[in-house]
Amino acid sequence: MTQVYNFCAGPAMLPVEVLRRAEQELCNWHGLGTSVMEISHRGEAFMQVAAEAEQDLRDLLKVPADYRILFCHGGARGQFAAVPLNLLGSERTARADYAVGGYWAQSAAKEAQRYCNPHAIDIAQRVDGKLSMKPMAQWDLLEESAYLHYCPNETIDGVTIDEEPDFGDRVVVADMSSTILSRPIDVSRYGLIYAGAQKNVGPAGITLVIVREDLLGRARREIPSILDYQVLVESDSMFNTPPTFAWYLSGMVFKWLKEQGGVSEMARRNQAKADLLYQAIDGGEFYRNDVAPANRSRMNVPFQMVDSALDPLFWDEARKAGLHALKGHKVAGGMRASIYNAMPLAGVQALVAFMADFARRHG
């Protein structure tokens, strides 16, 4: 069978070692004669899975002791609502800053309008025709706000903010759905981090939340219990039946990451993959990327061709070559290669070779 590399923005490629182990264990997990999908989430066996997953994630990100880790439902969009409902309290006139650099940050700000009057800050700018993000020192924040929300990596436009926040006592909330575990971060600089699993963590269906303990217990009275961080903490993320298989697979990914050398090693690999792909894009006139180098994403690399009429042919030929899901988002068009942790260097090398051949034949 032809080697297939999945460049989808999410659900994304999973480590092949994890998939093979899951295949081996699928019908007889730990000698129990049943699948992990069929056991009680409150039984001793699965509680051990949950405990190990939490500890492994804590180890990988060096999560401080005064932060709680939750495994939730609802994806990042669920957190778009959960964040204001948990952090704004009962005062409906409370304000929150939303730094908007792309589609997902804008979506979070739009959802927040249901619960407050968010202060949206446009941090995107064009410099010499290239999309870039304003430095954090230039963000026009309110003097008093309940929190600052931003998205460090925007998957559609392929922009990243590597600068870590330094806003004193201000509560910083980050949507790290597409960048978590791809590089080291200082968790103590954030009040709350959330991430949908389907890019760098595991399969779709589970969402990570890392929340500082002093932010618990602030939720509005009318918040749905399933979104209340305090309720989830008190129930060990099992207020209702959790997505156990996604939790189990995410835990396996955490163990795989530790075996590979942790997030520092992932950062090294991801930089190497991104450098190779951007060099291929910048190396001629056939392809282009419209993001300023300082803000180019290492996770999601969009690019266009000199003649957009060739796009469908590129997608089709790439798929036949085992390079799947390279069609750009409908908002941006063109091509997009998502190269998360599980994408091996060989996958990017195969893509770069295909791009060179395609340009030679159609340039």
UniProtKB/Swiss-Prot annotation:
L-glutamate binds at R42. The modification N6-(pyridoxal phosphate)lysine is found at K199. GO terms for molecular function: O-phospho-L-serine:2-oxoglutarate aminotransferase activity; pyridoxal phosphate binding. The keyword Amino-acid biosynthesis applies. InterPro entries: Aminotrans_V_dom, Aminotrans_V_PyrdxlP_BS, Pser_aminoTfrase, PyrdxlP-dep_Trfase, PyrdxlP-dep_Trfase_major, PyrdxlP-dep_Trfase_small. HAMAP family: SerC_aminotrans_5. This is Phosphoserine aminotransferase. It comes from Edwardsiella ictaluri (strain 93-146). The gene is serC.
